[in-house]
């Protein structure tokens, strides 16, 4: 497990606001100033202050593809650094300058620094010269308006190499109204990913969910097949 994650972490996972509560106040903040405003004002209930426990497990168990990896909506950069290694170069992507400044401040002196980078770009329009072997999405799908999900799937397809892998941590699987975060289901991922050329390799419960998210998450692993 990456030592930097433990030093930077300020949350034990118990104070993360459940989606049914976040949905009551976060939309107003997003509407007023966007995600940048959230980061400027410190209204980031989705930020665990450390790497996602599932990501740490996948890294420690050598269960992630090597090569180039992308973490869209990387925020404070915790998962980016957890994934980074000499065999895996990770790009953390976000539209918030404040989020990326925080990430750089936290991890700029990390021993892993040469194995990751942070980029301020729009996931829906950014197309780098080199594609990715792996993309990990936890927060983008549930944060965007539901009508944008087909465009999300299209971007995933265009950013992955042939036979690349998309890992989705599906959250929140709840019945709450409104958002962000907007409620999701396995079918909402299937409905947009399968038509563009993805195949589900596995859909499983997340045994490493933090306390407030237990029973509300599933791990999906998808392969780009055409």
Swiss-Prot record:
GO BP of this protein: methylation
Gene3D superfamilies hit by this protein: Vaccinia Virus protein VP39
GO terms of molecular function: thiocyanate methyltransferase activity; thiol S-methyltransferase activity
Modification sites for Phosphoserine: 85
pH effect on activity, per entry: Optimum pH is 8.
Catalytically driven reaction(s): thiocyanate + S-adenosyl-L-methionine = methyl thiocyanate + S-adenosyl-L-homocysteine
Enzyme category, top tier: transferase
Keywords recorded for this protein, A-Z: Methyltransferase, Phosphoprotein, S-adenosyl-L-methionine, Transferase
Protein name: Thiocyanate methyltransferase 1
Tissue: Ubiquitous.
Lineage, broadest ranks: Eukaryota, Viridiplantae, Streptophyta, Embryophyta, Tracheophyta
InterPro entries: SAM-dependent_MTases_sf, TPMT
PROSITE patterns: SAM_MT_TPMT (PS51585)
UniProt-annotated binding residues for S-adenosyl-L-methionine: 35, 39, 46, 73, 94, 122-123, 138
E.C. number: 2.1.1.n4
Family classification: Belongs to the class I-like SAM-binding methyltransferase superfamily. TPMT family.
UniProt-listed SUPFAM superfamilies: S-adenosyl-L-methionine-dependent methyltransferases
Summary of the function given for this chain in its UniProt record: S-adenosyl-L-methionine-dependent methyltransferase. Probably involved in glucosinolate metabolism and defense against phytopathogens. Highly reactive to thiocyanate (NCS(-)) derived from myrosinase-mediated hydrolysis of glucosinolates upon tissue damage. Also accepts halid ions as substrates with a lower affinity.
Organism encoding this protein: Brassica oleracea
């Amino acid at each position: 497990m990456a030592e930097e994650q433990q030093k930077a972490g300020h949350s034990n996972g118990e104070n993360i606001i459940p989606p049914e509560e976040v949905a009551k106040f976060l939309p107003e903040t997003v509407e007023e100033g966007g995600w940048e405003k959230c980061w400027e004002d410190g209204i980031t209930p989705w930020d665990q202050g450390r790497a996602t426990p599932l990501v740490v497990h996948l890294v420690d168990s050598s269960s992630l593809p090597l090569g180039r990896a992308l973490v869209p909506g990387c925020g404070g950069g915790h998962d980016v650094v957890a994934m980074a290694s000499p065999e895996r170069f990770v790009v953390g992507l976000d539209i918030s300058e404040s989020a990326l400044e925080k990430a750089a401040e936290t991890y700029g002196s990390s021993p892993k620094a040469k194995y990751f980078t942070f980029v301020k770009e729009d996931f829906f329009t950014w197309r780098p010269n080199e594609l990715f072997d792996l993309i990990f999405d936890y927060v983008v799908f549930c944060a965007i308006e539901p009508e944008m999900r087909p465009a999300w799937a299209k971007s995933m397809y265009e950013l992955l190499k042939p036979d690349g892998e998309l890992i989705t941590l599906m959250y929140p699987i709840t019945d709450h109204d409104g958002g962000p975060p907007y409620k999701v289901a396995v079918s909402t991922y299937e409905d947009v990913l399968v038509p563009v050329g993805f195949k589900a390799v596995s859909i499983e419960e997340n045994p490493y969910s933090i306390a407030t998210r237990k029973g509300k998450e599933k791990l999906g692993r998808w392969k780009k097949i055409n």
